[in-house]
Amino acid sequence: KYKDIGFGKVVFEGVSLWTKSALLDVFTRYLLLKKHRKAIRNRDLAVRKMVSLYGEKGVMMADSFIAMDEESIKHISHDCAFVDLPNLTPEEQKSCVFFYGSKEFDLIAAKKVLPQKYPQAKFHIWQGYGHCRKITENPRAYSMILRNEIFSSNC
């Protein structure tokens, strides 16, 4: 579809692979809007929850979430439920790396979609981790993992 865009290596962390999932859209929209309204009412609680999940970056993440407008949240929910997966050649697939935490919801779709749609892509599960928790636990170690992936031989 976008063959004018080229890449050497692409690393996806916890990316949604849900397609045409109206029920997921309704559920996530409801849940995110409810959490957003609660965060607006009680910033301190939102910050505590985010810090408990993501460490010191949680303050910035909570403030960013609070600052979002509801229309943006609805768009995020929709985009996560209706992903338009491109067709990739086997060579393009070999340049893709998909990372998921074993405790994250998007792993359900990844386990179904990746072997069928992108069988040549690398697929790794971080055992014991939730969504994007591997990144925030130790950013320096994670950056080394990314560096190793980017400079690996199948690029």
Put a short name on every predicted segment:
Residues 104-111:
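Conserved alpha/beta-hydrolase "acid-adjacent" motif
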Residues 10, 98, 123-125:
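Conserved beta-strand scaffold positions in the cores of enzyme catalytic domains, especially
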Residues 38-90:
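Conserved alpha/beta-hydrolase catalytic His-Asp/Glu region
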Residues 4-37:
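Flexible "cap/lid" loop of the alpha/beta hydrolase fold
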Residues 15, 101-102, 128:
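Cofactor-binding loop segments of dinucleotide-utilizing enzymes, especially the Rossmann-like FAD-
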Residues 2, 88-93, 116-118:
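Short, conserved loop/helix-junction motifs that constitute active-site signature segments
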Residues 121-155:
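Catalytic active-site module of serine/aspartate enzymes centered on a nucleophile-bearing elbow/loop
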Residues 91-92, 98-100:
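Short beta-strand/loop motif that positions the catalytic acidic residue
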